[in-house]
């Protein structure tokens, strides 16, 4: 039977084959006519690439069918250089976990009453439970920035 092979240049080659011929045989015949080595050939029929070991009958290629010849592209993306850093990586801050950390904000006196050791921020933006930091001369809210400075006693 006769089949047609259309190349990239638009040229059509006619080949005399049998339906029992393998794709390898067809590629060898194309090499004889065009001089393109079989490892660079890709044959497409009905939108599918034809695999070397299979026969023309496997792909239902009949007389006067047209195969499309495409050349195989070798290689891939360009190799990239490995990035070199001038400074070493910054070590991430590790959060220290302290069990029952809230207990340091409260104290239970002898009568069983719970006393708050830290001053709570009165600002409405901060919300309930926002404690102010105790500094040697002031109380400071880290959320809103409100500061209360201790009064110095005149001696």
From Swiss-Prot:
MF GO annotations: mRNA binding; structural constituent of ribosome; zinc ion binding
Cross-link (Glycyl lysine isopeptide (Gly-Lys) (interchain with K-? in acceptor proteins)): 76
Disulphide bonds in the chain: none
Cross-link Glycyl lysine isopeptide (Lys-Gly) (interchain with G-Cter in ubiquitin) per UniProt, renumbered positions: 48
Statement: the UniProt record of this protein carries the keyword Metal-binding: yes
Domain of life according to the entry: Eukaryota
ZnF start-end (C4-type): 121-144
Annotated Ubiquitin-like domain residues: 1-76
Cellular component per GO, a single term: cytoplasm
PROSITE patterns: UBIQUITIN_1 (PS00299), UBIQUITIN_2 (PS50053)
GO biological process: translation
Similarity comment: In the N-terminal section; belongs to the ubiquitin family. In the C-terminal section; belongs to the eukaryotic ribosomal protein eS31 family.
Protein name: Ubiquitin-ribosomal protein eS31 fusion protein
Highest classification ranks of the organism: Eukaryota, Viridiplantae, Streptophyta, Embryophyta, Tracheophyta
């Amino acid at each position: 039977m006769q089949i047609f092979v259309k190349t990239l240049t638009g040229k059509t080659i006619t080949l005399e084959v049998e339906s029992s011929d393998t794709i390898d045989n067809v590629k060898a015949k194309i090499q004889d006519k065009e001089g393109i080595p079989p490892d660079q050939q890709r044959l497409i029929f009905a939108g599918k690439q034809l695999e070397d070991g299979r026969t023309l009958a496997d792909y239902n290629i009949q007389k006067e069918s047209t195969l499309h010849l495409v050349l195989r592209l070798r290689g891939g993306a360009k190799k990239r250089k490995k990035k070199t850093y001038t400074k070493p990586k910054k070590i991430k801050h590790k959060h220290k976990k302290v069990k029952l950390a809230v207990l340091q904000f409260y104290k239970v006196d002898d009568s069983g009453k719970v006393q708050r050791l830290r001053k709570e921020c009165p600002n409405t933006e901060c919300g309930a439970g926002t404690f102010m930091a105790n500094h040697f001369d002031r109380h400071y809210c880290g959320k809103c920035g409100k500061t209360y400075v201790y009064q110095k006693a005149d001696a």
